[in-house]
């Protein structure tokens, strides 16, 4: 639990705990799929253990003067949750996502699925995570997974705007929010670059948010010319691996990370080569 009290660029890591939990779930399902389908009681129990971390609050961190910000976060999540009322399936859900998840649920890893249907090769970690959130014929929990990323995105912007002491970050958060408002009145009704709430079976925005957070932390470190702490290195590397497992394009973030660690690259590589390289190779 001590790690959750850490701050990277003054941003409380505890606010990213839902992402950490989903990353853990994805890795457990991915590894276990070499031996069994994910529709297995043992996989469920092991995968859902970290959810308890999301209810952890260190008492001395809670301050009543911040109750307004806490309520704003809760209100943001509630408003986003209203999307569940009218959400529909994306065409990719029927095309390959749900079928891929069904294979993950019922079978051990099936090699060469892309030879059967090329779009099976487009699956990502989202399908491994989503495979344990089926509820009979109701797929609303898959939509909730998308809402986790959207909620984290807005919680991050609220932090930058109202809690950060940096004028630059306040302006960045305000600029992103202002762009989102303007995009609602763009060509053909907007959605010309800003994130939106994905329909069920799509995870483009999940990757976009992971990529945004990853490169925010990297750029902030580069801007301040700060030495990268080992724990911050692991957090950034975790975000990079998570984004790569959603979209291979996430590897671009390694360029910025390499600039951060260029002076002590051997030390950092020795720290990361076993856990992250192992998970990366399993994913490939």
Regions found by a protein language model. Name each.
Residues 68-80, 264-284:
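Hydrophobic alpha-helical membrane-interfacial segments at the cytosolic entry of transmembrane helices
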Residues 80-176, 195-198:
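Active-site lumenal/periplasmic loops and adjacent helix-entry segments of GT-C-fold
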């Amino acid at each position: 639990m001590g790690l959750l009290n850490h701050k990277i660029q003054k941003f409380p890591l505890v606010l990213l705990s839902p992402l950490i939990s989903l990353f853990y779930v994805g890795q457990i399902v991915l590894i276990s799929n070499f031996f069994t389908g994910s529709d297995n009681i043992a996989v469920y129990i092991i995968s859902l253990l970290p959810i308890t971390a999301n209810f952890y609050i260190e008492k001395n961190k809670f301050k009543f003067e911040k109750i307004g910000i806490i309520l704003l976060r809760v209100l943001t999540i509630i408003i986003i949750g209203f999307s569940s009322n009218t959400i529909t399936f994306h065409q990719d859900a029927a095309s390959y996502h749900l079928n891929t998840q069904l294979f993950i649920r019922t079978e051990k890893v099936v090699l060469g699925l892309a030879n059967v249907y090329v779009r099976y090769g487009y699956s990502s970690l989202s399908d491994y995570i989503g495979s344990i959130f089926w509820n009979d014929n109701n797929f609303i929990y898959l939509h909730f997974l998308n809402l986790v990323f959207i909620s984290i995105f807005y919680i991050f912007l609220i932090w930058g705007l109202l809690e950060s002491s940096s004028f630059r970050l306040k302006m960045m958060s305000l600029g992103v929010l202002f762009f989102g408002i303007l995009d609602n009145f763009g060509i053909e009704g907007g959605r010309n670059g800003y994130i939106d709430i994905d329909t069920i079976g799509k995870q483009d925005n999940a990757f976009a948010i992971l990529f945004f957070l990853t490169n925010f932390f990297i750029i902030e470190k580069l801007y301040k010319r700060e030495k990268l702490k080992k724990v911050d290195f692991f957090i950034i590397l975790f975000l990079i691996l998570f984004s790569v497992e959603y979209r291979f394009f996430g590897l671009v973030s390694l360029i910025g990370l390499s600039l951060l660690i260029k002076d002590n690259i051997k030390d950092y590589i020795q720290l990361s080569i076993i856990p992250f390289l192992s998970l990366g190779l399993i994913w490939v």
